[in-house]
Structure formats: structure tokens, C-alpha cells
Amino acid sequence: MLAFRMRKVIFAIALLLSLLSPAHSACDDPLADGVDYSKCRFSDGQDLQGSFLPNSNLSFTSFIQVNFDKSIMMNSNLSFGTFPESTFYRANLYESVMIGANFEKTNFTGANLTNADLMGSTLIEANFQNANLMGANLISANLINANFEGANLIGANWTDGEKCGPQSIGDCKK
């Protein structure tokens, strides 16, 4: 009788854990909220404008020259992904983790990157014009020739680990 009860408890716990874990998707499944597309390679040049991808795992993915304009990707993991020459115009990346990702020549114009973690990311020639990077982590990021014109950098952790001051619009004033 005890063994039967234990099996029921184990089954109930396994069922509960399967319901609480993020959805694991095949790389060709439609993009959606909370899914795991880690290590997928998507076609170059796709138009994913307006995608709804909050809480999703896009780590180690490849999205070259992809349009994510006006997409909702808050609380998502884009770490170690490849996104060169992509566009995130007015995208919501609030509190997303983007550690070590490649965003070379990527357009973040008007994007919400509040509290985003971009530590160690490649942001060479990235465009952050009028983007909100308040509280973002840019420690050890490569910002060569990046454009921050009009960007809100208040409270951001700059590449050297120092916090940007309250007048940091367009550049980090420590």
C-alpha cells in the first residue's frame, strides 16, 4: 500500500513539474510566449516584426538580419545568441538577459532595454538612438562606434563597471 501511495505522489509531482516547466519547442514551431528555442538557427532575413516572445529562451540561437521591430521580448534570455544586422526598433526587451550575445550593427532605436543584462555582448556599431537603457548592465560589452544619441543611460552599469549618473542622456556621465 505504501509503494502505491509513493507512486501516486511521484506521479503527481512529475505532472506538476511538467506543467510548470517552460514549453520546449522544435525549432520550426511558431514563436510564442515562454518557449525554449535555445540552440536553434532561424533563417536569415526573417520578418518577425511584432512577435510576442516574453519569458522565452532564445539563448545560443542564430537570427541574422532579422526584423524584431515592435516585438515584445521582456524577461527573455538571448544570451550568446547571434543577432548581427538585426533590427529591434521600439522592441520591448525589459529585463532581458543578453549576456555575451552578438548584436554587431544591430538597430535598437527606441527600444526598451531597461534593466537588460548585456554584459560581455558585442555591440559594435549598434544603434541605440533614443533607446531606454536605464539600469542596463553593459559591463565588458564592446561598444566600438555604437550610437547612443538621445539614449537614456541613467543608472546603467557602464563597460568599466561604473554606474552612469542622473544626467546620462546620450552618453554615460559618471
Feature roles, as predicted:
Residues 2-10:
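Bacterial N-terminal signal peptides that target proteins for export
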Residues 10-19:
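Bacterial N-terminal signal peptides
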Residues 23-174:
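Tandem repeat scaffolds
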